[in-house]
Amino acid sequence: MRYKAVVEYEGTSFIGWQRQHGVVGKSVQESIERSIKEFCQQSVIVYAAGRTDAGVHATGQVVHFDLKVSREDYVIKNALNHYLRNEKVSILQLERVDEEFHARFSAKKRHYTYKISNREAPLCIDLMRMWHVPKRLNVENMREAASYIVGKHDFASFRAKDCQSKSSIKTVDSIDIIAAEEEININISAQSFLHKQVRITVGTFVECGMGLYPPAHVLEILEKKDRAAAGITAPAHGLYLTRVDY
């Protein structure tokens, strides 16, 4: 029986979503798999819609796994949350789904939010939940830069050097930059992204907002198809996987 769950986690506690052999620390995947084994004594593999990096948070990660036992959805959800009580992981929703459902390959769109604190004073409470950029950013310039990113492009300049994707061509469906007082939220959606594409995109927007180059320079970055041409990689702790559409 296949189950789908919506998961929330605080990413700074983990080495990322995926199990990594030879790396010190725990992954979100391992933590959930361990909770399932404690619940029903069954070893399973949990698959996720987004393989988030170390430090990246999630408020709407979607996973699936197969169980041999049959229980009410709420029983499984409550049991897993019980066994996850000492981890910074929470099962928000859980339901039985068709055997054809796959958390990663069935996904139609992934939604991320990047949170920036644009104030002069250092952060305390949100230190590992937002990127602190003390220099005042020109949000309108950032929005113009974003307009050049939306659509189908070769994003070779916006992917990590170790990205294993065969093609760097992706379609970004939408980018909304919302500024409220000292906080800037960048919402970006696509069916899929290259490794670190969102963080490199945000880093480029921030450099544009600082006045390091004009918004239209993003077009030159795209044309160069070279990681060195784009901006810095924004810190992981400002990024959230917020929703996955199916």
UniProtKB/Swiss-Prot annotation:
Its EC number is 5.4.99.12. It catalyses: uridine(38/39/40) in tRNA = pseudouridine(38/39/40) in tRNA. GO terms for molecular function: RNA binding; tRNA pseudouridine(38-40) synthase activity. It is an enzyme of class 5 (isomerase). The active site is at 53 (nucleophile). Disulfide bonds: none annotated. Belongs to the tRNA pseudouridine synthase TruA family. HAMAP family: TruA. Homodimer. This is tRNA pseudouridine synthase A.
